[in-house]
């Protein structure tokens, strides 16, 4: 199975790493990334077979974090493209049970990495 989810991640060009840190660019990327994750977290919430409260909590907590960071942004962050959302939803609907488990794992792993790098960047600020 190929990972074509296009999950958000921080890269050198986002200027969130200590070597080329730029607060404005970094905050914009963190906020945009969290916003992009909302689509994937909706999928997680709908398809997670474990404790539904945990899946909902991850979605809500990430949404609250996004709402806290948005006012700190000097640049207006654009919302993800609706066609991206609908094409991802179509991809998700066509998955079998095993692929759903793998997708959930990839989403959570990517979110964890993204949040760790974001926290490091925020500490630099």
Curated annotation (Swiss-Prot):
<comment type="subunit">
    <text>Component of a hexamer of two molecules each of IL6, IL6R and IL6ST; first binds to IL6R to associate with the signaling subunit IL6ST. Interacts with IL6R (via the N-terminal ectodomain); this interaction may be affected by IL6R-binding with SORL1, hence decreasing IL6 cis signaling. Interacts with SORL1 (via the N-terminal ectodomain); this interaction leads to IL6 internalization and lysosomal degradation. May form a trimeric complex with the soluble SORL1 ectodomain and soluble IL6R receptor; this interaction might stabilize circulating IL6, hence promoting IL6 trans signaling.</text>
</comment>
<dbReference type="GO" id="GO:0072540">
    <property type="term" value="P:T-helper 17 cell lineage commitment"/>
</dbReference>
<dbReference type="GO" id="GO:0070092">
    <property type="term" value="P:regulation of glucagon secretion"/>
</dbReference>
<dbReference type="GO" id="GO:0005125">
    <property type="term" value="F:cytokine activity"/>
</dbReference>
<dbReference type="GO" id="GO:0005138">
    <property type="term" value="F:interleukin-6 receptor binding"/>
</dbReference>
<dbReference type="GO" id="GO:0097421">
    <property type="term" value="P:liver regeneration"/>
</dbReference>
<dbReference type="Pfam" id="PF00489">
    <property type="entry name" value="IL6"/>
</dbReference>
<keyword id="KW-0339">Growth factor</keyword>
<dbReference type="GO" id="GO:0070102">
    <property type="term" value="P:interleukin-6-mediated signaling pathway"/>
</dbReference>
<dbReference type="GO" id="GO:0014823">
    <property type="term" value="P:response to activity"/>
</dbReference>
<keyword id="KW-1015">Disulfide bond</keyword>
<feature type="disulfide bond">
    <location>
        <begin position="16"/>
        <end position="26"/>
    </location>
</feature>
<dbReference type="GO" id="GO:0005896">
    <property type="term" value="C:interleukin-6 receptor complex"/>
</dbReference>
<dbReference type="InterPro" id="IPR030473">
    <property type="entry name" value="IL6/GCSF/MGF_CS"/>
</dbReference>
<keyword id="KW-0964">Secreted</keyword>
<dbReference type="GO" id="GO:0005615">
    <property type="term" value="C:extracellular space"/>
</dbReference>
<dbReference type="GO" id="GO:0046427">
    <property type="term" value="P:positive regulation of receptor signaling pathway via JAK-STAT"/>
</dbReference>
<protein>
    <recommendedName>
        <fullName>Interleukin-6</fullName>
    </recommendedName>
</protein>
<comment type="similarity">
    <text>Belongs to the IL-6 superfamily.</text>
</comment>
<dbReference type="GO" id="GO:0006953">
    <property type="term" value="P:acute-phase response"/>
</dbReference>
<dbReference type="GO" id="GO:0050796">
    <property type="term" value="P:regulation of insulin secretion"/>
</dbReference>
<dbReference type="InterPro" id="IPR009079">
    <property type="entry name" value="4_helix_cytokine-like_core"/>
</dbReference>
<dbReference type="GO" id="GO:0008083">
    <property type="term" value="F:growth factor activity"/>
</dbReference>
<dbReference type="GO" id="GO:0072574">
    <property type="term" value="P:hepatocyte proliferation"/>
</dbReference>
<dbReference type="GO" id="GO:0051240">
    <property type="term" value="P:positive regulation of multicellular organismal process"/>
</dbReference>
<keyword id="KW-0202">Cytokine</keyword>
<dbReference type="GO" id="GO:0010573">
    <property type="term" value="P:vascular endothelial growth factor production"/>
</dbReference>
<dbReference type="InterPro" id="IPR030474">
    <property type="entry name" value="IL-6/GCSF/MGF"/>
</dbReference>
<comment type="function">
    <text>Cytokine with a wide variety of biological functions in immunity, tissue regeneration, and metabolism. Binds to IL6R, then the complex associates to the signaling subunit IL6ST/gp130 to trigger the intracellular IL6-signaling pathway. The interaction with the membrane-bound IL6R and IL6ST stimulates 'classic signaling', whereas the binding of IL6 and soluble IL6R to IL6ST stimulates 'trans-signaling'. Alternatively, 'cluster signaling' occurs when membrane-bound IL6:IL6R complexes on transmitter cells activate IL6ST receptors on neighboring receiver cells.</text>
</comment>
<keyword id="KW-0011">Acute phase</keyword>
<dbReference type="GO" id="GO:1904894">
    <property type="term" value="P:positive regulation of receptor signaling pathway via STAT"/>
</dbReference>
<comment type="function">
    <text>IL6 is a potent inducer of the acute phase response. Rapid production of IL6 contributes to host defense during infection and tissue injury, but excessive IL6 synthesis is involved in disease pathology. In the innate immune response, is synthesized by myeloid cells, such as macrophages and dendritic cells, upon recognition of pathogens through toll-like receptors (TLRs) at the site of infection or tissue injury. In the adaptive immune response, is required for the differentiation of B cells into immunoglobulin-secreting cells.</text>
</comment>
<dbReference type="InterPro" id="IPR003574">
    <property type="entry name" value="IL-6-like"/>
</dbReference>
<dbReference type="GO" id="GO:0042593">
    <property type="term" value="P:glucose homeostasis"/>
</dbReference>
